[in-house]
Structure formats: structure tokens, C-alpha cells
Amino acid sequence: MFRLVNTSQGLRPALISKFKHAKTGGTNPSPFSTTTTNAPTNTTPTSNSKYESTFQFKRAQSTVAPPATVATTIQTPSSQNAAANPYRSKLDSFSRIYHVPNHVVGRRTEKIDHTATDEMATLILDENFRNQMTETDLYRYAASIYSAAIAVRRQRLEMSRNRDRDNAASFGDDLKYQSAAIALAESIAAGEFPQQVSARTLFKVFATLMQFKLNDEIMNLWETGVAQSEGEDLGDIGKMYLDHTVLSVVLEVAYDSKRFSYEEILRIYEMSLVENEPIHPYLLERIGQIAIKHGDHARGLDCLEQLMNNYENNPRARSILGALSQIHIAFIGNCKDTIIAKRFFEKAVDESDHLPYTILLKAPYVVSFLQNCNALGDSFENIVDMWSRVCQFYIKRREEQPSRMVTINSGLFKILFDKYPEPSMEAMKLMKLTFAKCKNINEHFLNTLISHMPWKDRTLVNDVVSAYDKFKVPKSVVSHRIILKNAGNVEYTPEEILTLWNQLLLKLDSEGYKYIANADWAAIRLATIFSEQFKSPERDCLYYSIVRTYKNYMQHDEAALRFLRATVRDATVYKQISRITTEENPTFEINYDIEVPEFKNLKENTNYPKVTKKVTDANPNLL
């Protein structure tokens, strides 16, 4: 496999020659440029979906042969044979998944039907099936994986689905599309789609891998693909990996993972340009982002200016609008020069209605912006003010997703408690300021505050917990878990911790839970046996007594097995917990008699001692 390494000799001459050779490749007219060309147009069929244009890239600077040229080498079955060919029939009836781009105003959460993509992921393992595929078939499959991965993540972050750690199916969609993307990337790298692969398909594959932060897989696939251009019988496959849309993903990953130096990134970028041909907005935006991260603000501003020029020529091109939005927030979150960053922040928060593109004020960029301001000496009062303005921006735009608010609240409280790990009059004053500046004191605000608060004083912690009642914020199951977890950092008595545990169980019961979930067991462990600040025999024995009392309330037999197996790593804990399996009613150094409330929904679901006996039998030396 070809490797580009950062050596004293710089880029390998072989790679440079590949880029120079690619610059002579055929091109197609671009939807974002007014440049005229005599090259053939992209003849890929379009969908009836109004979002199709988001994914169809008619590349002005393409380094690959036009899709129409590739298509002529594929023998598509005739209509008469298609009816008798079950593979062709399935390909023709494949229902592609779409997602709505972020910059589309009024976007709603997508409803995803995974059936067709699931079936395709299985069928594509069959060589005979792959041989029936066309370039369009492969692209539609890759685009479906990409869109589904985005939609599934949105559903999770927007809390349109209930994701319980004990429900294995809740992770299924994420793992399914991650596995599908990896499998498709491996098949492409292995040369299993020599006629079907195209630059637009590669872009979808790379972008999906990027969604899952699979940086090594991205670079390995790209380097393998570039190396393929050495083969005499592989046509333009190697050139496809030098397409601007593909490079827009690869170069960012290469920079972030330190695979290439900044200078090498610029050399690759400059060699990918073709005279008198436009640069794809995605590549312009990514090079701008990389420059901003590197502190090359002049180049970042140049990229923004070029994108604005493209916008003036084609103000409705979604690729340009999305690129403008992304490079704008990159200046906010990634620019270490806070004078520049604050100017873009002001534009986004106060003047967004006057911008030609929609600002997507992503929470991680906001947090990075606040951290940069803090690092360069901004007062906490000023940081709270900027945080409050962002919150108002989200409320005004109806973008108050729980995950987004938790992220920016976490960033704010981390700054506060890093400055004040111990309570003081000044710290208390600033914490009260966050309450005063918060326009919507809700569960997410209070949960995040308690999660990050390192203060151990029981009175101070109780004052914060009382804010749920003071501001009429109902405590959810998550709130009760967070309060219980935090008890591990507070000087509570075992009786007070038991009260918090009982409050959690009553909330579970009122919400219709039939079992005590793994997240609940994790919370009580952090409050007792895993307490770093106040670990004691009293807390340890309280935990053992709770497990003894509620051992059969776990979700099912498998949950009970996982519960005990997880304790094997700690010999002391395992020795005590295993007694609940091997002894009928064990007593501990300090015995707590725990009274079980009358539940309406919580119930015993397993015979814990019987189920977990296989674990203790397998590890007799640890008893």
C-alpha cells in the first residue's frame, strides 16, 4: 500500500506525478460556476426528491472520466432479462434514503426506513449481485448509508428516540451503518467494483467514514486508491481519489490526524487545481478550515472571499451555501485570534438575518470559542454574556435541542469550575450570575451543573439540587441518576445516599420501568464503592446490601451475567458480590436492612443466584 509520510524529502515524487497527471483529466460543468465548457454533461439519472441536487456533484474540476463514459462500459440487462433477473429487480426497486441538509430552513427530523439498505448490505456480499450493479446502483447505496448515518445521529441527539444503555437494539442502527460503510470501503479497496466506482460514490463513502471518525480507514482507503493509478488496466480509478469532493474529506482528516503537514496539504491542494476551472465549494471550505486551524487567517479569508464570489454567480447553489455556513462557524470556533473570531460571532448571533446563508451555530464550535476567549483572558462575566446570547439565539431559532444545550452548558461550567475547583464568595457570585443570565432554567441546565460541580460541601450541593423545586423543574430519571452519581463527591451519610436511591427507584416505577437498568446500577456504584472522595466501609456495605436486596430486578438473565462479570476486574468487590450468588442470604461487615417499596411496575425479572452461578463456578480462585 502506498504511504505518504512526512519525511525530510517531503512528498514522494510518484504522488506528485499522479497529481500532475490528474490535472489533465476530463471535466464536467459545475452547478456552482458560470464557466462554460465543451466537456460532456453529467448524465446520471436524477431522483424525484427535491433534495437530490444536494448529492449530485457535476464536477467542474473533476479528475475522473465523465460518468457517461464509465456507464458505456457497463452492460445493463435488457428490460426482458430484468424481469427474469431477481438481482436486477432488487436493484431497480431499491429505495434510497435521503437526509435534509442542515442549512435547509425549517428542516424536520427524518423518518428512516432501514429495510432496503439492510437487504442491500447483505446482497452486496454476493459477487454475482455486485456484477449486476451499475455506477448509479453503487452510488445510491453509498448515498443511502451516508444519509442514514446522519439521520440516525440527528434522531439520537434530538432525543426523538429513547436510547437506553441496556437495550442492545438502541446501538444497532449506529453499528449497522458504520459496519456497512467499512465493508463498502474494504470492497472498493479490494477492487471489487472496478467498473462501478466513481468519484461521487467515493465522496459518500469517505464522508460516512468521517461521520464515525474512522480516520485510519479514510487514509488507508485513499492511499490504496491513489496507488491504483499505477495499474495500466485500471483506467481512471486512481484519478477519482483526487477529485475535489474526495480531497475535501481526505485533506481535513490528514491534517487533523497529523498524517500530512500543513505545507504538504497546501501542495496537494494546489496540484489538484486546473487552470481556468473552478474549485469545488467543499474543497475551498475545507482548505479554509485547515488554514484557520493552522493560524493562516489570510488564506482562510481568501477562501471565504472566493466562496462569496461563487455565491454572487450562483446564489441558489446549496453546496456554496453550506460551505459558506461551515467556514463562518470555523472562524468562530477554530480561530485563535479572538478579535477575528468575535467579529464572526457577532455576525452569527446578532446579524444572521442579514447574511445570505443560514448560520448553523454548532455547539462544539461555540464551546471552542468560549474556551479560546477564556484562554486569552476574557473575564468569566464576558464569557457568561456570550453564552447567554448563544442560548437566546437557539431559542429564537427554535434550535434548543437537548444535546446542543448540554454541550454548551458543559463548556461554560467546565470553565467556571476549572477556575474555582473550591467554593468561594467569588465562585458563588459567578454561579449565581449563570442562573441570572440563563433564559430557560430547565432540566438540562441543572443536570449539567450538578454533573460538573466538584464542590463537596453538602449544604452547597443541596442548595443547587433544591433549584429543581425552586424553578419548578421536574426531575426526570436522568436527573435522579445524576444527583445520585454526584453523591460520590459529597459528604453524605449512607442513609442519605439510600434516600437518593429510593427516590430514583420510585421515579423509575412511576415512568413504567419494569427493571433496574444498568445506568441505575452505575449511579449507585459511583456513589458508594467507586466514590473517589468519600470511599468507606459504610458506603461499600450499603452497595452490597442494595445488590442483595434488588438482585432479581435486573432486566433479564444476560443483564445479570454482565453485571457480575463486570466486577471480576476488582477482586475485593467481586469477592463480596459473588457471595450474593454463592450464599443464600449473606451478611456483610455492616449490614443494612433495606425495605423495598410497593412498586406498580418495577418487578423481579430474573433468578440472579441461579443465573450467575456459571460465573462464580468459572472463577473459583477469586472467591
From Swiss-Prot:
Superkingdom assignment: Eukaryota
UniProt region (Disordered), positions on chain:
20-49
Q: Provide this UniProt record's keywords sorted from A to Z.
A: Membrane, Mitochondrion, Mitochondrion inner membrane, Phosphoprotein, Sporulation, Transit peptide
Q: How does it sit in the membrane?
A: Peripheral membrane protein
- The species this protein belongs to is Lodderomyces elongisporus (strain ATCC 11503 / CBS 2605 / JCM 1781 / NBRC 1676 / NRRL YB-4239) (Yeast)
Q: Where is the protein situated, by its record's location annotation?
A: Mitochondrion inner membrane
Q: What residues does the transit peptide encompass?
A: 1-60
Q: A GO biological process this protein is involved in?
A: sporulation resulting in formation of a cellular spore
Role: Binds the 3'-UTR of mitochondrial mRNAs. Involved in the processing or stability of mitochondrial mRNAs.
Say if the entry is tagged with keyword Zinc.
no
- The identity of this protein, by name, is RNA-binding protein RMD9, mitochondrial
**GO CC field:** mitochondrial inner membrane
Give the family, as the similarity comment puts it. Belongs to the RMD9 family.
Low complexity bias: where?
27-49
The subunit structure is:
Monomer.
Q: How is it modified after translation?
A: Phosphorylated. Phosphorylation promotes binding to RNA.
Is this entry keyworded DNA-binding? no
